[in-house]
Design a protein with these regions (language model features):
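Detector for Asparagine
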Residues: 11-14, 41, 61, 77
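Residue-level marker of intrinsically disordered, low-complexity segments enriched
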Residues: 28-31, 76-78
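Short, non-transmembrane alpha-helical segments in secretory-pathway proteins
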Residues: 1-28
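Amphipathic alpha-helical interaction segments
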Residues: 20-21, 42-43, 68, 80
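Functionally constrained cores in energy, signaling, and assembly domains
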Residues: 13-16, 57, 71
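Amphipathic, interaction-prone secondary-structure segments
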Residues: 29-66
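A short, surface-exposed interaction/processing loop segment used at functional sites
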Residues: 64-82
Length: 82
């Protein structure tokens, strides 16, 4: 399941991302930040060490045997003190 999520993200980079900006991305370039499986469904949050700031959410619907990819770009990271 996690390998499938990595493959989906790597394929997105290689098919959709700007080919001038990023060289070929493999599953080894993608890491899982968080993963959860409930019954036949699962969700994974993934990223890479690439400087583009992309973050991904892959959701798998086991009833429909379909995966969905959401791609996000980090806009800002600010410190908030207590």
């Amino acid at each position: 399941m996690q390998e499938k999520a990595k493959q989906i993200v790597a394929n997105w980079y290689n098919d959709e991302a700007g080919k001038d900006e990023i060289s070929a991305v493999t599953e080894e370039d993608v890491y899982v930040v968080w993963f959860c499986k409930t019954l036949q469904n699962w969700k994974a949050l993934l990223s890479t060490d690439l400087p583009d700031g992309m973050y991904f959410e892959v959701t798998y619907n086991g009833d429909k045997k379909e995966a969905y990819l959401d791609a996000y770009r980090k806009i800002k990271n600010v410190k908030i003190s207590d």
